A protein has these predicted regions:
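Leu/Val/Ala/Ile-rich N-terminal alpha-helices, chiefly Sec-type signal peptides and the beginnings
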Residues: 1-68
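Hydrophobic alpha-helical membrane segments, chiefly transmembrane helices and signal peptide h-regions
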Residues: 29-39, 96-106, 134-153, 179
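Long, low-complexity or tandemly repetitive, helically biased scaffold regions used
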Residues: 38, 42-129
Length: 279
């Protein structure tokens, strides 16, 4: 059982150093959205017991951070083209949707009225869950959409405007695609990287272990809901600060998969017999 933080504080630390480059800021923002959505999912799966104020505070922070990224992008001398304009509009849509999510979370009522409690009325928990689900739906596609916008914007920026640090060597197309899927919030791991998933597809985890050894990605234990009903939480794989820098220098390269591709860039692993943990 976890104690709810102060109503003015978000669910987790969102005050990371602000990068001077728009691409890095967008990559970091996508990571915050993925983390926020995971926290709501855990609540919906009965794996968290924080009050709605903390979730609303996180959503408010994300809304402000998104508008901040939009301002940073608009300050760049980008060509006035349809792809760039669409990328900015996409970011504005995310900010507006997050504002709606904030309202749902802010109006959620966590306390069961005494009268209803005495009568055994199950409604309050159900109504609270509905508010959480509606808020979750509004931010569901935020992280992938931000990565799409970051990719488009990176294509139109000079190379030295992608990152505030020197390029990380060795980011080939396969590793870059893995980092993109991590940035989208699509990658989970189980049993210390022995098994990894891009969304619901089992994949070989060797590349992920290599990236973790190079401090480009990290696992956040028990931070993502299991794909199996009633299963224990999985570890979400997230970009580190070094991983954000590395991807910011490589995100503009052509990718072998599209934004809406159903299959991951990672090679599928051989299908083993299911273990007890996955039943």
């Amino acid at each position: 059982m976890t104690t709810s933080p102060d109503s003015d504080h978000p669910l987790f630390d969102m005050d990371a150093p602000v990068s001077p480059t728009p691409v890095e800021r967008l990559l970091a923002l996508a990571g915050l959205y993925a983390q926020h959505n995971d926290r709501i999912d855990l609540w919906l799966h009965g794996r968290a017991d924080l009050g709605p104020d903390a979730y609303a505070a996180s959503a408010r922070h994300l809304e402000r951070a998104t508008y901040g990224c939009i301002t940073t992008v608009q300050k760049q001398r980008l060509p006035v083209t349809e792809p760039v304009a669409s990328a900015v509009v996409r970011l504005k849509q995310i900010a507006h949707l997050t504002s709606g999510a904030t309202r749902y979370l802010s109006t959620a009522q966590p306390v069961v009225p005494d009268a209803d409690a005495k009568r055994g009325v199950p409604g309050p928990r159900r109504r609270l869950a509905r508010c959480f689900q509606l808020a979750r739906d509004l931010t569901a596609l935020a992280a992938p959409a931000i990565i799409d916008s970051a990719t488009c914007i990176a294509h139109r920026l000079p190379a030295d405007a992608h990152s505030s640090s020197p390029a990380t060597p060795g980011i080939d197309s396969a590793r870059r695609d893995v980092l993109v899927e991590v940035a989208r919030g699509h990658v989970t791991a189980f049993q210390t990287m022995q098994m990894a998933y891009v969304q619901a597809t089992r994949v070989d985890s060797g590349t992920l272990r290599d990236l973790e050894a190079e401090h480009l990605v990290r696992r956040e234990p028990d931070s993502a809901p299991s794909p199996y009903h009633g299963g224990a939480p999985y570890d979400r794989v997230r970009l580190t600060a070094l991983g954000i820098t590395a991807l910011s220098t490589a995100i503009h390269r052509p990718t072998r998969i599209g934004p809406s591709a159903a299959r991951p860039a990672l090679a599928p692993a051989p299908t083993p017999a299911r273990t007890r943990a996955h039943r």
